[in-house]
Amino acid sequence: MDYKSSLIQDGNPMENLEKQLICPICLEMFTKPVVILPCQHNLCRKCANDIFQAANPYWTSRGSSVSMSGGRFRCPTCRHEVIMDRHGVYGLQRNLLVENIIDIYKQECSSRPLQKGSHPMCKEHEDEKINIYCLTCEVPTCSMCKVFGIHKACEVAPLQSVFQGQKTELNNCISMLVAGNDRVQTIITQLEDSRRVTKENSHQVKEELSQKFDTLYAILDEKKSELLQRITQEQEKKLSFIEALIQQYQEQLDKSTKLVETAIQSLDEPGGATFLLTAKQLIKSIVEASKGCQLGKTEQGFENMDFFTLDLEHIADALRAIDFGTDEEEEEFIEEEDQEEEESTEGKEEGHQ
């Protein structure tokens, strides 16, 4: 964590320092002990343990007598995969530097007088700060508006209580959206595997088909090209469908990621009023985005290409009529041949009589 460069970027070093000391999980100042991940991001050890336990539900605690092989989870900041040994998060190194900075920061804050920060003012009463929230109109306002102004008949609540409530709701929405992004990423991985298996299966049936045609290549050369083309068309059709799905899910993931970034930036607003001016619409957008992820998927057995297999146990006169078929069609063909042979035999016997 580059604290020096972060502090230089703005004119208020203490506010910037406080932002650097916020845990991305609990959204509060780091609680000691603070652990540092391999990707160099920091977490409260309690928060790190919470997400580790959520990602590894069958991992037992440090005091268990059962020998565990460890587990893994993703850094909430950069999504880098963190691999743990059998000690879990207790095997992570403590960031003593950050802990010392937190102590110094708290001492500095306790010794400094409260400073007047920027606070939104009421548009109707320019000398009044926005300090209450109108529940009826769902907007922040000032006390004068409640006593004498347009919100006189409205129901109001303390700004801080509404701020905390909507902040909690937004946190829950972010968690829900992040979980949805993980599911989308899983689907993308599955689709990529599906694409690979489809290619492998297509290659396999092509090889099998080529080997069977080699025995009768002189007769089947033209037919061979035709059937291979059909397999290729089916492969391209399936791969085009899968590629389109991957692109749709990737676009959904990109939109969700941008929305998460916007929401996290909104959480960094130091004042409740500024936050509440945009929080309602932001929460609505996140909920709609979470409900809107209704994209298509491949059906079970989509990658299967077995219906292109061929059995070349046919007489030479039937070679030019060969096509991909089912077992039932082949059985009917055999039954028709047997019936023709029986009729021919019966006719010969009647002729001898």
Curated annotation (Swiss-Prot):
ZnF B box-type span: 117-159
Q: What class of enzyme is it?
A: transferase
Provide the GO MF annotations for this entry.
titin binding; ubiquitin protein ligase activity; zinc ion binding
Q: Do you know which SUPFAM superfamilies this protein is assigned to?
A: B-box zinc-binding domain, RING/U-box
User: What is the annotated localization of this protein?
Assistant: Cytoplasm; Nucleus; Cytoplasm, Myofibril, Sarcomere, M line; Cytoplasm, Myofibril, Sarcomere, Z line
Question: What are the COS domain coordinates in residue numbering?
Answer: 267-325
Q: Which residues form a coiled coil?
A: 207-269
What happens upon changing F73S? Rare variant; found in a patient with hypertrophic cardiomyopathy; uncertain significance
Q: Where is this region: Disordered?
A: 326-353
Consequence of changing S5L: Rare variant; found in a patient with hypertrophic cardiomyopathy; uncertain significance
Q: Where is the signal peptide?
A: none
The reactions it catalyses are:
S-ubiquitinyl-[E2 ubiquitin-conjugating enzyme]-L-cysteine + [acceptor protein]-L-lysine = [E2 ubiquitin-conjugating enzyme]-L-cysteine + N(6)-ubiquitinyl-[acceptor protein]-L-lysine
Query: Zinc finger (RING-type) locations?
Result: 23-79
Which tissues does it occur in?
Muscle specific. Selectively expressed in heart and skeletal muscle. Also expressed in the iris.
Question: Keywords in UniProt for this one?
Answer: Coiled coil, Cytoplasm, Metal-binding, Muscle protein, Nucleus, Transferase, Ubl conjugation pathway, Zinc, Zinc-finger
SMART domains, per the entry: BBOX, RING
The enzyme's E.C. designation: 2.3.2.27
GO BP: innate immune response; muscle contraction; negative regulation of cardiac muscle hypertrophy; negative regulation of glycolytic process; protein ubiquitination; response to electrical stimulus involved in regulation of muscle adaptation; response to glucocorticoid; response to interleukin-1
Segments of this protein annotated with the region Interaction with TTN? 74-218
**Positions with biased composition (Acidic residues):** 326-344
Q: Which GO terms describe its cellular component?
A: cytoplasm; M band; microtubule; nucleus; Z disc
This protein's pathway: Protein modification; protein ubiquitination
Subunit relationships: Homodimer. Homooligomer and heterooligomer. Interacts with SUMO2, titin/TTN and GMEB1. Interacts with TRIM54 and probably with TRIM55 and TNNI3. Forms a ternary complex with RACK1 and PRKCE. Interacts with CKM.
Q: Describe its function.
A: E3 ubiquitin ligase. Mediates the ubiquitination and subsequent proteasomal degradation of CKM, GMEB1 and HIBADH. Regulates the proteasomal degradation of muscle proteins under amino acid starvation, where muscle protein is catabolized to provide other organs with amino acids. Inhibits de novo skeletal muscle protein synthesis under amino acid starvation. Regulates proteasomal degradation of cardiac troponin I/TNNI3 and probably of other sarcomeric-associated proteins. May play a role in striated muscle atrophy and hypertrophy by regulating an anti-hypertrophic PKC-mediated signaling pathway.
Free-text note regarding domains: The RING-type zinc finger mediates interaction with SUMO2 and localization to the nucleus. Also required for the E3 ubiquitin ligase activity. The B box-type zinc finger mediates homodimerization.
* Official protein name in the record: E3 ubiquitin-protein ligase TRIM63
Origin organism of this chain? Homo sapiens (Human)
Q: What is the lineage of its organism?
A: Eukaryota, Metazoa, Chordata, Craniata, Vertebrata
Q: Which gene encodes it?
A: TRIM63
